[in-house]
Amino acid sequence: MSMFCYQCEQSAAPGGCTVQGVCGKTAPVANLQDELTAALVGLARALDVKGQTKEGVDYLMRGLFMCVTNVNFSEDRVQEFIDEVNAYHAKIDSAAQNFDWEQLWKGEEDIVSLRSTLLLGMRGMAAYAWHAARLGFHDADVDAWFIKGLVEFAKDHSAEEWLNLLMEFGQINLKCMAVLDKANTETYGTPVPTTVPLTVEPGPFIVVTGHDLHDLNQLLEQTDGKGVNIYTHGEMLPCHAYPELKKHPQLKGNFGTAWQNQQKEFVDVPGAFLFTTNCIMPPKENYKANIFTTDMVGFDGCAHVEEKADGTKDFSAVIERAIELGGYKEAQEFTGINGGHEVTTGFGHGTVLGIADKVIDAVKAGAIKHFFLVGGCDGAKVGRNYYTEFVKQTPNDTVVLTLACGKFRFNDMNIGEIGGIPRILDMGQCNDAYSAIQVAVALAGAFECDVNDLPLTLVLSWYEQKAVCILLTLLALGIRNIYIGPSLPKFFSSNVLNILVEKFQLHPITTPEADMKAILG
């Protein structure tokens, strides 16, 4: 069976994956995800005609999220969701037709490129919107745009019209990141700077990976007083900085590095693993029985924790497995990829803007000469050590803002401070690009200049679709001279790439030395 997928950075050359996904996705799953996408387009068209419903928008968010890279590998789960979408579609408008899924990737090259970019960006935004929705937070414009975007996807547009839609979407995604920031901070408090150990203590433990704070909070509440420790993994690291989460003493530290190392790091580990979102890799038999998935995540053969009608989840099976495994007999001192034994997080916009006067004074005094935002997705492709070397080469009078799992390339390094300000400031998860934007806007206001005139350079790494929606937001805000790597998206046609280079001065990364020289002169 053949397939087509080119949505992630590791897609097979030259044009994408056609037999099996490099991510591990099979052709049947890839085709079912295309079928699901077409069903979502059909549902959106029905909602556009019959009127928006909360349940309908939830289906759109969840379905798009299910198609994000490394979220769901289960044929049964995807098929079940397609059936649910089609049943709801028929309930509200039995006459409406689904989009032909075989047409998803067909057409004139540049149009398909732009249309694909919108679809993939919407998949990324759906993840953010769904996390906010689970905490009871919505934005009316964001909800409406899930319908609009999918409806537009089935229409014919010129290249210019598609570009305009991409810029409109970028602004909508900014609203989406804002509502998720509000959901997280109003529910769990404003993140505070927190040092997180990489040591695993003796006794039973659960490693929580993904992005979902709501799931982690429920697990923490269910493990209170049970002698089971909790460790974050990957993009869950920033959870240590939220006051309402860190008040649980069993939230001990962070396990492992970024997602792509799990097939090595999870082997022979006597603990349970809970996947709340991506990135799950096909688990090895050595630890498959210790894997639990929930929400949109799925992998055949792994236990799945369903959400109950009241919105809660019972994680007792995960807890029981951790107790059964028993954990380590003695403390295990793990390190980051550079040998560090601890990392620091919690420098979201609430914290950084709280010391804005100190930062501004340091810039005016010449103590801080440049800011870099070095972050985004990590991945397995050779060449991602670029980001480690780039940060190592940043001058001592510069500050590195970082976010998402790309930070694991360097977040265990100690590169010093400037006047008490750490030179590496971890702003949080990938959605906390919102924090970086707020800091940039505040600095521009303080110095009475445009964001593009600040001594600030964005050096981004990408892997999956949340990086796509963030990039579109940055472009929609008019931010120029962004460096992106380790390779360019295969869904950018040569003409579309030329437009992005000419209009937005988008730069493919080269070498740390050459790029640093180009940036700083």
Task: For each feature predicted by the language model, list its residue ranges.
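Long, compositionally biased, glycine/small-hydrophobic-enriched stretches that function as flexible linkers
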Residues: S2-T190, T195-G203, V207, G227, ...
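Anaerobic metallocofactor- and corrinoid-dependent redox/one-carbon enzyme cores
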Residues: S2-A12, C17, K25-V29, Q33, ...
